């Protein structure tokens, strides 16, 4: 698993959130993953977070999901759930300690889903990555393609947005991404029809070309990577990009 920037493991005080009696409530590997890498975003879709016992309490009164005899929990039991993650689309991943269930609370669907995981023998920080991949398959009905990477929330991340204006002598954004790869071979490349992200350890971040918008380029970097950032920024400006204020 590629780690985008230096992880921020949980402090001793934060680790105390996971009492020995409660550790079995969480999905396999979750506690070790958090203790090793801290909070962050997994493969661009799941925000892995510390347990939150309060965020779902108001949802027990909102009537967002339908409940019947096949529902894994009742509407009042939503308030008892512990959120451990959110997707970039606003879905919740949570555990319900009293019934020992892992639950998916979707933002754009009417039913809460119980996630049934396959048993696994290993128990390390890589285990939870496999669990998240399995959750993705169950929820979306397909496997997530591409490489496995994790973006820790360091609290020291900076960013710059640029625009590649259209013009006869200008490369397309797709061409610019290819030129960047050739000039600065990345440590990792994640690309699809909508976006291309080139990851660099020197940046502690990545350069993202937004194919969907056709003009947007963004550089995400750690504050102590100023020299590497300056080189990338100067190159992008030399190719016709403009800073977005």
PLM features: residue spans?
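A surface-exposed partner-binding patch
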Residues: 1-96, 136-245
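Compact, glycine/acidic-enriched structural inserts
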Residues: 103-142
């Amino acid at each position: 698993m590629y780690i985008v920037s230096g992880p921020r493991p949980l402090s001793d005080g934060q680790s105390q959130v996971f009492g020995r009696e409660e550790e079995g409530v969480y999905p396999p590997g979750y506690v070790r993953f958090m203790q090793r890498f801290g909070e962050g975003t997994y493969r661009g879709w799941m925000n892995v977070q510390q347990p939150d016992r309060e965020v779902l309490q108001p949802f027990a009164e909102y009537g967002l999901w339908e409940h019947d005899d096949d529902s894994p929990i009742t509407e009042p039991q939503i308030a008892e759930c512990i959120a451990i993650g959110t997707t970039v689309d606003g879905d919740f991943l949570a555990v319900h300690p009293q019934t020992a269930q892992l639950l998916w609370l979707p933002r754009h669907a009417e039913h809460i889903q119980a996630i049934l995981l396959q048993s696994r023998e290993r128990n390390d920080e890589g285990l939870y990555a496999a669990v998240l991949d399995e959750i993705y398959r169950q929820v979306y009905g397909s496997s997530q393609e591409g490489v496995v990477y994790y973006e820790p929330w360091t609290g020291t991340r900076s960013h710059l947005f640029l625009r590649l204006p259209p013009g006869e002598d200008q490369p397309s954004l797709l061409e610019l991404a290819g030129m960047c790869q050739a000039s600065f071979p990345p440590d990792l490349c994640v690309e699809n029809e909508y976006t291309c992200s080139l990851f660099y350890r020197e940046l502690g971040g990545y350069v993202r070309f937004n194919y969907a918008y056709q003009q947007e380029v963004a550089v995400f970097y750690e504050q102590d990577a100023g020299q590497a950032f300056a080189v990338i920024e100067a190159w992008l400006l030399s190719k016709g990009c403009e800073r977005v204020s």
